[in-house]
Amino acid sequence: RPTRERDLEMLKKSAYAMLKNTGYEEISLSSLSSSDYSQLGELVNFLIDEFGSKGINISLPSLRIDAFSLDVMSKVQDIRKSSLTFAPEAGSQRLRDVINKGLTEEVILDGAGQAFEGGWNRVKLYFMLGQPTETEEDMKGIAWLAEKISERYYEVPKEQRNGKCQIVVSTSFFVPKPFTPFQWAQMCTKEEFLHRAYVVNHEIKEQKNKKSIKYNWHEADVTVLEGILARGDRKVAKAIRSAYEKGCLFDSW
């Protein structure tokens, strides 16, 4: 896969412009894998020097755990901490291999452990339900992985912990997209999506550290609509226009 990166100076100017024109108090470094950006360290140092004293939060989502940088994490921990976002995508190693995620449970737990040791206590985990070949074991694996991550937090010496552990598990639903390896895969129905979310939710409630784990899932109705828009042909344009004429404007879909 060819690497394309934003120019460092352009990112600096964009940060200035966004804070000046929006009034926001957070800068989020977002990409498919923020930690792979070759100038991430220099960019983070710049943001801290320029905006840290002003209480601007620096958020680091989209971190690929196997490329997680403890050095970068330690640089931003003294500013207003936000949660760290990891995307295991699937609860089992088998399914991660199917979707070519390339992460092992050991690497995931090690990355989370580094985050906890670096002063974080809030972690967001993103998964996807309804992926090809998914079994109930894979669904329950999401809860088991969240539990193992929470256990990793409590392995950190008490004096080094930063309050109560907070793990937010979020699941979206799989939508087969054109020109992707799974473009012809079957998509779940609304009822199937909700059943899978129920399995995860029920299993989380069975875990020892369930109070440390919060679970959110995507709207099944919106996912089904997304699937129609993704797989539909030009005829779908008529439905979109009809929805607009009936008052749909800036709707989530």
Model-derived features: positions:
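Auxiliary Fe-S-binding modules of radical SAM enzymes
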Residues: 20, 139-253
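Short helix/loop capping segments that flank catalytic or ligand/cofactor-binding pockets
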Residues: 1, 38, 94-95, 179-180, ...
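Conserved SAM/AdoMet-binding glycine-rich loop
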Residues: 16-168
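Phosphate-binding active sites in nucleotide-utilizing proteins
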Residues: 8-16
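Canonical Radical SAM [4Fe-4S] cluster-binding loop centered on the CxxxCxxC motif
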Residues: 1-9
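Short, conserved loop/turn and helix-capping segments at secondary-structure boundaries
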Residues: 5, 102-105, 187-194
